[in-house]
Amino acid sequence: MMKFRFRRQGADPQREKLKQELFAFNKTVEHGFPNQPSALAFDPELRIMAIGTRSGAVKIYGAPGVEFTGLHRDAATVTQMHFLTGQGRLLSLLDDSSLHLWEIVHHNGCAHLEEALSFQLPSRPGFDGASAPLSLTRVTVVLLVAASDIAALGTEGSSVFFLDVTTLTLLEGQTLAPGEVLRSVPDDYRCGKALGPVESLQGHLRDPTKILIGYSRGLLVIWNQASQCVDHIFLGNQQLESLCWGRDSSTVVSSHSDGSYAVWSVDAGSFPTLQPTVATTPYGPFPCKAINKILWRNCESGGHFIIFSGGMPRASYGDRHCVSVLRAETLVTLDFTSRIIDFFTVHSTRPEDEFDDPQALAVLLEEELVVLDLQTPGWPAVPAPYLAPLHSSAITCSAHVASVPAKLWARIVSAGEQQSPQPVSSALSWPITGGRNLAQEPSQRGLLLTGHEDGTVRFWDASGVALRPLYKLSTAGLFQTDCEHADSLAQAAEDDWPPFRKVGCFDPYSDDPRLGVQKVALCKYTAQMVVAGTAGQVLVLELSDVPVEQAVSVAIIDLLQDREGFTWKGHERLSPRTGPLPWPAGFQPRVLVQCLPPAAVTAVTLHTEWSLVAFGTSHGFGLFDYQRKSPVLARCTLHPNDSLAMEGPLSRVKSLKKSLRQSFRRIRKSRVSGKKRAANASSKLQEANAQLAEQACPHDVEMTPVQRRIEPRSADDSLSGVVRCLYFADTFLRDGAHHGPTMWAGTNSGSVFAYALEVPAAAVGGEKRPEQAVEAVLGKEVQLMHRAPVVAIAVLDGRGRPLPEPYEASRDLAQAPDMQGGHAVLIASEEQFKVFTLPKVSAKTKFKLTAHEGCRVRKVALATFASVACEDYAETCLACLTNLGDVHVFSVPGLRPQVHYSCIRKEDISGIASCVFTRHGQGFYLISPSEFERFSLSARNITEPLCSLDINWPRDATQASYRIRESPKLSQANGTPSILLAPQSLDGSPDPAHSMGPDTPEPPEAALSPMSIDSATSADTTLDTTGDVTVEDVKDFLGSSEESEKNLRNLAEDEAHACAILIK
């Protein structure tokens, strides 16, 4: 009979079809700023911008929501990019001197980016392929000749090659060799020296046949491509960095390595030109750094703009990253906090226009993109609708809030608009507006909250493709730090010369690492939130539309409860400011709760309907009533051997003494493992469990090699008292007839504490509850036998659905939970998921995820998956991410595996740690310090770029035949989006679900019938726990007096045998 129990049932076609309608894995879009940018391009006709990166990625941006992404086959650095103006084509140059042609093509009404052709410059004539010096043919600069499909390639060997862009083939007979240029140079200038590499190629605005060529030695040449001759020569002597034509083409501007720039007059009467008309060193006379790039733009109102990067005094400000903007007598030195990659101006490019009249200056930095309005006095920055630097301060935590009410959304946006730090606001709209966003307006608004190292919390609009900044909350003003001193120094520096002006928001330095935000929780119905930090600070805030000046109440909770033998060796707590403090419109602090010891907060949860906030650290957890501003509960979870928990966050290395002690313990344990131990009640119970396991798993049934037993962990493991999760629920804890508020806490050692709360009920129709004190009584204490850290806890109602959020049911925003049937609690540990019935806490279902060696649960969330085939059908499932980077989806409460996907590379530890799931089957994780990858597990709820671009060039069959491949998405470099469906029959029949009405804001959850772990339908579970019998120690502190006496009597006889539950 046991053989039939382990036989796998066949897949149910109906269920497999339903799973395909519910689940689908897609990596959809990358939010944030590209990591390690290396090149920049702009198409003034289509108004689109391209950014290349060191990893070989190409990203094109237009209007908000218009994005295209491509990835070169070789992970080489993109050094230059150039648009074929108005054609939707882009030419990229890599550091291996290969050229690649990209095209924006349309399929089914939407556009995407494809690589069409690639080209490698052949070896220098006269050399064979093996002996040719690579430096001679290394491409240093690329120019796309206007009004033609020709590209000029400048090389390190001083040659200029010409290329047919449509086919990426060399044009024979048109190569400009250095010898031909040297014949036009006076003998005294040559002096037997080479010209040097080609540093710059610039096209003539009105005459495309004329090309300005600059060599590194300083020689400037105007080459006429039509007549194949030199039109003009400028005999420069300074090492050249960059070139620029004047608008009327009568002047040429050059910048040099000594921090100077020169203006040359193109006078046909003087050949060659020996001296420039103007030569100046803006920040001289002392030695200066090179001016890497210079732009000259004239204005109809008179005068001209001179914009250049670099040129700072080498000794004083050689480490600054600056772009200088000079017009008439006005000079502004834009001081950035990261390296300058490139910049361009948005100006008129029509040949018939007489003036440039620049509107904006776009500067691409290593860590952000800054756009300045050149038409408004003061040249203020233009707010960016995307490409905001997520990592302006290092991201320390993140959270997602789905279905934000419109009223709260408007209040947050209004508060953010009042935060403009600039004295003058820009009247210029975002200048990069190309393409059309075809995606529908999102029906629901989503907020992404990111906590940062500098104590700020940033609010992002995550409803669509473009991640737009909305509001920034700063908590540093509540505490005494050294920032005032730094601000005074910065103010003093601004009065000096050069006239520095701080631009951009990237600031990687934090005034105090204790300000770092560790946990964030927001109630979208009451506009209240909690922010918890690195030094044990827990801040409760409330949204206000007007600025106020008020003092903040401070409460201190000692989690150790004066326990002896523990001494905190970490950092001190932050000192709060006293007295009334000014607070701008936005989230304003209501009360500050300080945990002692001041360790980093590891878990937090907020229940606004009860006005309670719970928080946990590595020492214990606390409960605080922020309405009465009084503590309710403090519980220490430290084990006597948890000495490492007192070291603080900076002491992560075990001491040599402790490491040696544990090593000798392991050696002794291995030597005596074969000896017979003294029999006691606990060992007898374990032996009985082992016998049951052997009986349940006959020897003729072969176990899968990757499966293993879950080994129980030692109770004295370091940091076993860390609180991993906290949870509020209105459920049955005392008995099956009376439900009430409860609080649940899970720790690193597999302990779960459940408290019954006495919360005064609010009056009918009232928002606030009475002022009576809240009481907390320990109801249950569950110790998981395998002692794996508890990652998440959730209570399921009688229909198997998770309980709604605070105020959702009372305000008719979600269906009320079923309080008639039996509730259950889902406890997710790092090794397995278990469902217990309430209030008896007896085993109902479980799933052992660690049957795969080395697999651990890292992130868990309950999500709603709507069907693409039927709008009225949805299921609530459990989504989890493992340390291997795999995402698994399970049914609830049956814990049946539905699908699993490979999402993140297992080596990407930071990406796995940063993952956040949404309530509707999507997720975010960091692929770099500045970028979130967005993915979707839902077949219906997908956020991806859907856009088009109006292109003005014909697409004939010849050009289409050159297309070699579609570019892979950059996101695939960080995990293969393969889809693996569970092969076995999972639920027999589709799970029932109630309908989704149009007036229901939140999608409904599936009402799944509870399954017993011994039922016949559970026999097809692939990763069953048979043979891995564990015992949970459950202590009930709310039973009847007779049961309590019995428990105490049993506890006195044998503590390990008390209230034991056997789970098979």
Swiss-Prot record:
GO terms for molecular function: GTPase activator activity; myosin II binding; protein kinase binding; structural molecule activity. Expressed in brain, kidney, and muscle but is barely seen in heart and placenta. Down-regulated or lost in all cell lines and in most of the tumor samples analyzed. Loss was associated with advanced stage of the disease. One of its GO terms (biological process) is establishment or maintenance of epithelial cell apical/basal polarity. SUPFAM superfamilies: WD40 repeat-like (SSF50978). InterPro entries: Lethal2_giant (IPR000664), LLGL2 (IPR013577), WD40/YVTN_repeat-like_dom_sf (IPR015943), WD40_repeat_dom_sf (IPR036322), WD40_rpt (IPR001680). One of its GO terms (cellular component) is trans-Golgi network membrane. Residues 966-1010 are annotated as: Disordered. Pfam families: LLGL (PF08366). WD repeats lie at residues 38-71, 78-119, 139-176, 200-234, 240-272, 290-332, 340-374, 396-474, 518-593, 602-663, 723-783, 792-844, 849-902, 916-939. The modification Phosphothreonine is found at residue 958. Keywords: Cell projection, Cytoplasm, Cytoskeleton, Endosome, Exocytosis, Golgi apparatus, Membrane, Phosphoprotein, Repeat, WD repeat. The modification Phosphoserine is found at residues 663, 967, 985. The keyword Membrane applies. Associated with nonmuscle myosin II heavy chain. Interacts with PRKCI/aPKC, PARD6B/Par-6 and PARD6A. Interacts with STX4A. Interacts with RAB10 (GDP-bound form); the interaction is direct and promotes RAB10 association with membranes and activation through competition with the Rab inhibitor GDI1. Interacts with DCAF1. Down-regulation of LLGL1 is associated with the progression of colorectal cancer and melanoma. Located within the Smith-Magenis syndrome region on chromosome 17; deleted in patients with this syndrome. Expression increases cell adhesion and decreases cell migration. Substitutes for Drosophila l(2)gl tumor suppressor function in vivo. Belongs to the WD repeat L(2)GL family. Cortical cytoskeleton protein found in a complex involved in maintaining cell polarity and epithelial integrity. Involved in the regulation of mitotic spindle orientation, proliferation, differentiation and tissue organization of neuroepithelial cells. Involved in axonogenesis through RAB10 activation thereby regulating vesicular membrane trafficking toward the axonal plasma membrane. This is Lethal(2) giant larvae protein homolog 1. It comes from Homo sapiens (Human). The lineage of its organism: Eukaryota, Metazoa, Chordata, Craniata, Vertebrata.
